[in-house]
Curated annotation (Swiss-Prot):
The organism of origin for this protein: Geobacter metallireducens (strain ATCC 53774 / DSM 7210 / GS-15)
Catalytic activity: (2R,3S)-3-isopropylmalate = (2S)-2-isopropylmalate
EC number: 4.2.1.33
Official protein name in the record: 3-isopropylmalate dehydratase large subunit
Lineage of the organism: Bacteria, Pseudomonadati, Thermodesulfobacteriota, Desulfuromonadia, Geobacterales
Function comment: Catalyzes the isomerization between 2-isopropylmalate and 3-isopropylmalate, via the formation of 2-isopropylmaleate.
Record keyword Kinase present: no
GO BP annotation list: L-leucine biosynthetic process
Encoding gene, per UniProt annotation: leuC
């Protein structure tokens, strides 16, 4: 019987199986940021275990509130900064070099097919786009990962999600994943690996695949996974070209991590994306979604473009194409947060930042701040934000605020009209 990608990764990284169905895995990468890691650091220090298993396998960044907005966030940042220096963690990114973790670390080439990756952040599932097993963990698991380089997981069960057809005009990876979450529900993939397959995924860029995998957690998934292919090789080639004689050789190795044709899945779901419209959330759960035709015209106060879901260069290009030569509605605040310094620089070089600023957007440094209502775009009570982020929980972007999740294209059209708007008329 064949194996899924997740099963192959578990088998190759297995260290121990202390209980039936529980597997302890060796970790390839442990990621850290300043919101959750200081709690783990403090506990390890209190226990007299201020050590790291391998400083070369730890990647750390200050990204959620940066630069620090007050004494509390400055203290959190300092704790991570001091810890990284104390343990000679080379891959630490401080103010001026930092970006949103789930965009920055792939951009640096840190994730490879077949890797095991953890972080004290639920959207760690993003990195499954590379054919890795990547999962968010709690403080205790993060501590063990930092100290010993292992983590315990339940036996993986995978749901295969076949995305068939062709993406219509104005429909993007964000619309697809919102639709899938709407079909599954927020608990529909709990403790499962969501394996994204089919011609639609095959045709996607790595950026779009990361958008898909990023929101696996919104359906309860432990991780999202895409099959490594030549798209993966091309993305990683600048980092691996000295390791392989050719791209074909890299592809041959990467392909060993692909699910076998006779792999067994808990469920197999088929979706035809050809019939999709742009999708928007309407309530306080990510599975509360509507096609644009049923929600267009709803007013918003703010439009936010950015985050680990949609703050990449591809996303900025999509939005800028719609915004070029136009102004955002006077009733709306537009905020753009490019996800990394490189994305910011590349967007500047392409003239995208000029387009956003001329349209009336405020452009911030790379940060997660607005997404979780901590800085650079917090909502007031009663305000509504059209956002390219991944969570629309009550108060997520500010106490008493409401969030409509949507694609960069839909958010750009919404900014122009001041109400939720169909981007297809601008394409």
């Amino acid at each position: 019987m064949g194996k899924t990608t997740a099963e192959k990764i578990f088998a190759s990284h297995l260290v121990d199986e202390p209980f039936s169905g529980t597997k302890v895995l060796r970790l390839d990468v442990v990621m850290c940021h300043e919101i959750t890691t200081p709690i783990a650091i403090a506990d390890l220090m209190a226990r007299g275990k201020d050590r790291v298993f391998d400083p070369t396998k730890i990647k750390a960044v200050i990204d959620h509130v940066t630069p620090s907005k007050d004494s509390k966030t400055a203290t959190q940042a300092k704790m991570l900064r001091d810890w990284a220096r104390r343990h000679a963690i080379k891959d630490f990114f401080d103010v001026g070099h930092n970006g949103v973790c789930h965009a920055l670390f792939p951009e640096k080439g840190y994730i490879r097919p077949g890797y095991t990756v953890i972080m004290g952040d639920s959207h760690t599932c993003t990195h499954g786009a590379f054919g890795a097993f990547a999962a968010g963990v709690g403080t205790t698991d993060l501590e063990v990962g930092i100290l010993k380089g292992v983590c315990a997981f339940r036996e993986p069960k995978s749901i295969r999600i076949n995305l068939n057809g062709t993406l219509p005009k104005g429909v993007y990876a964000k619309d697809v994943i919102l639709y899938v979450i709407g079909q599954l529900g927020v608990n529909g993939a709990t403790d499962r690996v969501m394996e994204f397959r089919g011609p639609v995924v095959d045709a996607m860029t790595m950026e779009s695949r990361m958008t898909l995998c990023n929101m696996a957690i919104e359906a309860g998934g432990t991780s999202g996974i895409c099959m490594p292919d030549m798209v993966t090789v091309e993305y990683l080639w600048p980092f691996i070209e000295n390791e392989y004689p050719s791209k074909e050789a890299a592809l041959a190795e990467f392909s060993t991590w692909r699910s076998d044709d006779d792999a067994v899945y808990e469920r197999v779901l088929d979706f035809d994306v050809s019939v999709l419209e742009p999708i928007v959330t309407f309530g306080y759960k990510p599975d509360q979604v509507k096609p644009i035709s049923e929600i267009a015209g709803s007013p918003v106060d703010q439009v936010y473009l950015g985050s680990c879901t949609n703050g990449r260069l591809e996303d900025l290009r999509i939005a800028a194409r719609i915004l070029k030569g136009k102004k955002i509605a006077p009733s709306v605040r537009g905020i753009l947060s490019p996800a990394t310094p490189k994305i910011y620089k590349d967007a500047m070089a392409e003239g995208l930042i000029d387009i956003f600023m001329e349209a009336g957007f405020c452009v911030t440094n790379p940060t997660c701040g607005a997404c979780l209502g901590m800085s650079n775009g917090v909502l007031a009570e009663g305000e509504v934000c059209a956002s390219t982020t991944n969570r629309n929980f009550m108060g997520r972007m500010g106490k008493g605020g409401m969030v409509h999740l949507m694609s960069p294209a839909t958010s750009a059209a919404t900014a122009i009209e001041g109400v939720i708007a169909d981007p297809r008329k601008y394409l």
